[in-house]
């Protein structure tokens, strides 16, 4: 479990100014006041959206504002209301007051909409202030100020994709290339000593969460190396990406079979989870080494998808994919991102169907 926090300021719109106006028409010498009311300022509304998976689209945004109401006009015309600010958040997001820590909203259901801050009321036009003693009021109300608040959006994340590989297989480099995570990276084993999560953005609203897990060694299920502790972290991931280091002294097929064995020894359920294979550091070996991996495991080569490099062997089907990549040389990184997102979405749909029965 990983908690994503975003702190930002939000402000509702100011109400529009009331209008000072008098009726001016032919043959009407002393028309009375007819100034319209200002429009209401826009609200700050939080909307729960199941198609939004993370809070990454709010990163780096310090202040978000709803629109102000428009001023009133003559002939008692009401000013237009300001446009609401809609904050789209994934289910499970909690909104807190940044200063006090008080929970303001708890968003759970898809489609749920709640007003966080109301916009300011529009000012009254001068026609409201006419009376026997003052039939030509030359003042109108100003619009009410909007409300401003610093909030914290908090979301508990479970990784969609767990990266599984031997130490120094390129997991940290990949997650830092694809996401906003910045793990420590160096050319020695066991750089990653704790699991790190990164949010991989596919577009403005779609994203998935990737976990960089400490490298597995033989005997991990017995607690060797960093052992059982990190295997717990991938139990709840929906998809496993095996990271096979083509430049390693360990044979690629041996790496894959050993990693599968370690997961199976720890948990049959974990080993049976949907997976894909990334053949890392492909720029450091000849194509023949990649083809040899395909042949030894009986993997058929298919047409590339997601604009993968057509000069490198790859495999795509409805359940999995095998893709050579290089984070450093930026080979097939975009293809990997879209292929993983496609796999994660398929797994989520399958899980929802199973839970509905």
From Swiss-Prot:
Cofactor(s) the protein requires to work: Mg(2+)
Domain Obg residue range list: 1-158
UniProt-listed InterPro entries: G_OBG, GTP-bd, GTP-bd_Obg/CgtA, GTP1-OBG_CS, GTP1_OBG_dom, GTP1_OBG_dom_sf, OBG_GTPase, P-loop_NTPase
UniProt keywords, alphabetically: Cytoplasm, GTP-binding, Hydrolase, Magnesium, Metal-binding, Nucleotide-binding
Cystine connections: none
Main location: cytoplasm
Compartments, as annotated in UniProt: Cytoplasm
Chain ranges passing through the membrane: none
EC number, as in UniProt: 3.6.5.-
GO cellular component: cytoplasm
Pfam family, one: GTP1_OBG
UniProt key word Translocase: no
Record has Hydrolase as a keyword: yes
Domain named OBG-type G: residues: 159-345
GO biological process: ribosome biogenesis
GO function terms (MF aspect): GTP binding; GTPase activity; magnesium ion binding
Binding site for GTP: 165-172, 190-194, 212-215, 280-283, 326-328
Family: Belongs to the TRAFAC class OBG-HflX-like GTPase superfamily. OBG GTPase family.
Task performed by this protein: An essential GTPase which binds GTP, GDP and possibly (p)ppGpp with moderate affinity, with high nucleotide exchange rates and a fairly low GTP hydrolysis rate. Plays a role in control of the cell cycle, stress response, ribosome biogenesis and in those bacteria that undergo differentiation, in morphogenesis control.
Subunit structure: Monomer.
Protein's name according to its UniProt entry: GTPase Obg
Organism: Nautilia profundicola (strain ATCC BAA-1463 / DSM 18972 / AmH)
